[in-house]
Amino acid sequence: LFGFSDSLLRRQGGYFEDDGTKRDTADTSVFDPLICELAYRWFCPVEGQVIDPFAGGSVRGIVAGCLGRQYWGCDLRTEQIAANEVQAEQIAPQVRPVWVCGDSMETLADAPEADFVFSCPPYADLEVYSDDPADLSAMSYEDFAAAYYDAIRLANARRTAHAVERHSEEMASAK
């Protein structure tokens, strides 16, 4: 496949030190670029639009750009968006990812229509990202579950389904 899993993880500041050794850390996890690449190749059309309501790190956006997919991701933390922009500039995908800062419950209304909704949401309080009351990782489990499912419903509302018949043009398009 693309063959940049290890290098992207290193640039992301994730699991590997600069010399390639595994880092022993309690930091937040880094999304595996190989899983991301496979998901995009299998489930998102070329030049398709990916929507990510819980963007976090840069991996999903950079891999989308490297594969020619459009990417729109949302994260609450300005420092995370800034770090993602720096990493995207260093790696320079052919299609630049778009990251917006804000609560996905508010920003998804302005997101483009999606061909593929793909994310890695917080795991309740397993990894805590901030003390922002809108941060799912800072919520009680009950509040987390309610907010998580609401965000997923909003993200899914941004996708468009297409049906194509074997010998004709596109037959239907529906939200």
Predicted regions and their residues:
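Class I S-adenosyl-L-methionine-dependent methyltransferase catalytic core
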Residues: 1-175
